[in-house]
């Protein structure tokens, strides 16, 4: 809640003293073609996110059709744009639960989602570190290279050492008895973390998701006619990835603007109205694509539910009719009449 209020405060501070006329001009001059390309790449990013979650569900819960998992992923993303603190993840879990059946508890589905989020965070961390290490960054950002290299080395060391220490078993033993079943289901749902092949496939898909997000940012820079180098797009991508880790207003409103406007102005000389218009364009593109895809997914879920109900009703009617016929006595016909 405090983080959400902080995001709102940052948004209010960013708007105060701003030339609203210049902001309106920047929004009015946006290129529609590049904006459509950014929206398409944002949709592709959400598709990759759903596919990555399906890999985790297959490893830890059940094998589900792609359309149901991608639809649930899109519903959750749409709910995140309307609810604060990423509460839309609950809608994501409940949307996919009806397709799993009664055999898998909610905790196992939530475990698969948590594992997918963890792998997505690992992919984002690797991309951010590689950007800092490889790309020429302006100003003080270039001094972050030793820290980025140290963070990468520490992460690799932890990935190699922690699985051998058996800390998971010790932590599970410290859980109260009444909660061990829930924790065990969560761990079972995150089985993708222990499956080498599934983990690799999921990480590759997450890399595709991040690549689509970066492409969407580049297209939006072109849409707002911002003449900045490639490092600006990478910087915006990294800042938005870090801002997404904080619970905030619906869709990350406030934190996203604070993460984009000041760095673009101080490092690349972009005016505050244009930078704010660009950040609002990022926000509007993400929200619009999520809501449109979520609406389509909800309609698809309702159609599937109606077809399922009709099939079940037809099956019950078909089962009742033979039983009625079996219990019915034959009517006397002409052959049974006595002349």
Model-derived regions: residue spans:
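Predominantly cytoplasmic-facing regulatory/coupling regions of multi-pass membrane proteins
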Residues: 1-74, 133-245, 270, 277-280, ...
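Extended non-transmembrane interhelical loops and adjacent amphipathic helices
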Residues: 55-58, 70-101
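Discrete transmembrane alpha-helix packing/kink hotspots characteristic
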Residues: 83, 123, 289-293
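Interfacial segments of multi-pass membrane proteins
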Residues: 96-100, 236, 258-274, 278
